[in-house]
């Protein structure tokens, strides 16, 4: 009896032109601190307890095909291991980006245009840009800086596949203020001009990359719509959202925003470029919503959140990306001395949203259950291609075509099982 299997449209790191395929799901991790954890931490383990030799080489096996890395202009502590993780200068990002590309992964570059964190409350001009006073000067600086960064990365075989022009820019960028609602003091003309120059630099210097405009109002559909309506003439590809339920609300709020964006911007893709949830110790302060009553701060609760998020996003055809923020976190990074000074750690304080547990007495760090749930997003879009897998010896690519010998790192199907060529 012949068995028919539905071939899932899985997009993994083996495709060199992954960013140009229409039905891709980008399954991502923001691994901006990976280098520091590799230098100052025990190895990462898989669910069977085996040591992961190279995390970038391993993550395609669980369905991850994209890695996001932030870039600061002149980070405040480029050589420090603490306290904030603000160490990603161009040299750091170039070296990590080259590793990402060599592993066959998509590289998402997150341009902060700042010396430190750029977010809704901080969009400061880099100190070395203080001579840029007018909008025209700032726009020109963004164009030149973006071009320089992309050329440097390209020369190092680290050209990004996706580029964020700004990070969580709902309220402005490099000191030019706007709001996602009516405010008489806003400078939307100046704001858009700066973005235009950043996007222009990407198109000219990295023409195959997709451009992301990233905000964090995912829990407010009205404000999100207001913001992106202001960018109606901007040349970009993807609406990028941060979604942290403890700040942005429950899944129904996100769904309202996704529905609004899908109806209002049918020509734009949508991605959740940042999300995370607690695996322990829900904070006693700082959270807008006590979501621990829905998803407890535990291994099971973190997994339940990711499972529900993957299921939710699969309902929206314009949504094609999900990226987990800081999954490489495993405590502060020094597990030989829990009382070590800050200079001996990767970060100063535990955030407790990583996808590995800090295990001081183990041979390495064990993964949380949510790690393996994240990769499910890669299989949540179905092409419904019927393929005859009755002959166990035959191999098939992800288009349903029979192949003889898969290339190295090529994903293929044999006997109904997804495998990767060696």
What are these regions (language model features)?
Residues 260, 280-291, 296-308, 312, ...:
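Aromatic-rich peripheral "rim/lid" segments of glycoside hydrolase catalytic domains that contact
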Residues 379-402:
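Residue-level detector of functionally pivotal "anchor" positions at catalytic/ligand-binding pockets or at interdomain
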Residues 52-56, 189, 204-210, 219-291, ...:
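Glycoside hydrolase catalytic-domain groove-lining segments
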Residues 25-31, 67-69, 107-111, 161-165, ...:
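Hydrophobic faces of well-ordered beta-strands that scaffold small-molecule active sites
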Residues 20-58:
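Boundary/entry segment of secreted carbohydrate-active catalytic domains
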Residues 1-21, 381-382:
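Bacterial Sec-dependent N-terminal signal peptides
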Residues 411-422:
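C-terminal tail/sorting-segment detector
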Residues 58-210, 214-216:
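Substrate-binding cleft and catalytic face of glycoside hydrolase catalytic domains
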